Swiss-Prot record:
<dbReference type="GO" id="GO:0008137">
    <property type="term" value="F:NADH dehydrogenase (ubiquinone) activity"/>
</dbReference>
<protein>
    <recommendedName>
        <fullName>NADH-ubiquinone oxidoreductase chain 4</fullName>
        <ecNumber>7.1.1.2</ecNumber>
    </recommendedName>
</protein>
<comment type="similarity">
    <text>Belongs to the complex I subunit 4 family.</text>
</comment>
<keyword id="KW-0812">Transmembrane</keyword>
<keyword id="KW-1133">Transmembrane helix</keyword>
<feature type="transmembrane region" description="Helical">
    <location>
        <begin position="34"/>
        <end position="54"/>
    </location>
</feature>
<dbReference type="GO" id="GO:0015990">
    <property type="term" value="P:electron transport coupled proton transport"/>
</dbReference>
<dbReference type="Pfam" id="PF00361">
    <property type="entry name" value="Proton_antipo_M"/>
</dbReference>
<keyword id="KW-0249">Electron transport</keyword>
<dbReference type="GO" id="GO:0048039">
    <property type="term" value="F:ubiquinone binding"/>
</dbReference>
<dbReference type="InterPro" id="IPR001750">
    <property type="entry name" value="ND/Mrp_TM"/>
</dbReference>
<dbReference type="InterPro" id="IPR003918">
    <property type="entry name" value="NADH_UbQ_OxRdtase"/>
</dbReference>
<comment type="function">
    <text>Core subunit of the mitochondrial membrane respiratory chain NADH dehydrogenase (Complex I) that is believed to belong to the minimal assembly required for catalysis. Complex I functions in the transfer of electrons from NADH to the respiratory chain. The immediate electron acceptor for the enzyme is believed to be ubiquinone.</text>
</comment>
<keyword id="KW-0496">Mitochondrion</keyword>
<dbReference type="GO" id="GO:0042773">
    <property type="term" value="P:ATP synthesis coupled electron transport"/>
</dbReference>
<keyword id="KW-0813">Transport</keyword>
<keyword id="KW-0679">Respiratory chain</keyword>
């Protein structure tokens, strides 16, 4: 069920980050280098999850692995225990909670009309459902974290924190962001562009689907204009 995927990506996955924040208050600071393996593991996990996204053909699997890769960045930022890292992690959890939930919602919208989640079989929707294509574009751009979205603010804070802690981490972060942009654009182009499948009677999008996307993306845009509400 799509509701389960949306709740899992938006709320339950972020509870792990909240748990790490609460645990860090009782543990020593990172000056002991005790957490170095955990930070490296979190960044490496984020990169591997991104690489896994590149080889996915299933739409829901791709979005799920994307959520996991972002949580790797969140975990690394929290473990460093700096104010900027904590702010960046909190902001990314909120921003990606909205974004991943919106992507799952769009994936279900596509699935209801094509009855498949394979990327190459869901092509050509930009001709049939132009408004849905607009939602796909906005959600993917937010997933890539383009400025001035909240996702960009959070990733900038996390990147600054990790670079200040160890400049070498910029290599893994840069690679991770590059792969994120690659699979997000691949997902958009695969599902929306290309020739429309023949003998495909597609029903139009409903008002409730547009309302649902508005409820996901409007809070993100509003918080992006006033990020001090959560930072």
């Amino acid at each position: 069920p799509i509701a389960g995927s949306m709740v899992l990506a938006a709320i339950l996955l972020k509870l792990g980050g909240y748990g790490i924040i609460r645990m860090m208050q009782a543990l020593p600071t990172t000056k002991t280098d005790m957490f170095l393996p955990l930070i490296v593991l979190a960044l490496w996990g984020a990169t591997l999850a991104n690489l896994t996204c590149l080889q996915q053909t299933d739409l829901k699997s791709l979005i799920a692995y994307s959520s996991i890769s972002h949580m790797g960045l969140v975990a690394a930022a929290i473990i460093i225990q700096t104010p900027w890292g904590l702010s960046g992690a909190m902001t990314l959890m909120i921003a990606h909670g909205f974004t991943s939930s919106a992507l799952f919602c769009l994936a279900n919208t596509t699935y209801e009309r094509t009855h498949t989640r394979i990327l190459i079989l869901t092509r050509g929707f930009h001709n049939i459902l132009p408004m849905a294509t607009t939602w796909w574009l906005l959600a993917n751009l937010m997933n890539i974290a383009i400025p001035p979205t909240l996702n960009f603010t959070s990733e900038l804070l996390i990147t600054s924190t990790l670079f200040n802690w160890c400049p070498t981490t910029i290599i893994m972060l840069g690679l991770s962001m590059l792969i994120t942009a690659s699979y997000s654009l691949h997902m958009f182009l695969s599902t929306q562009m290309g020739p429309t499948p023949l003998n495909n009677q597609t029903e139009p999008t409903h008002s409730r689907e547009h309302l649902l996307m508005m409820l996901h993306l409007t809070p993100l845009v509003l918080i992006s204009m006033k990020p001090e509400l959560i930072i």
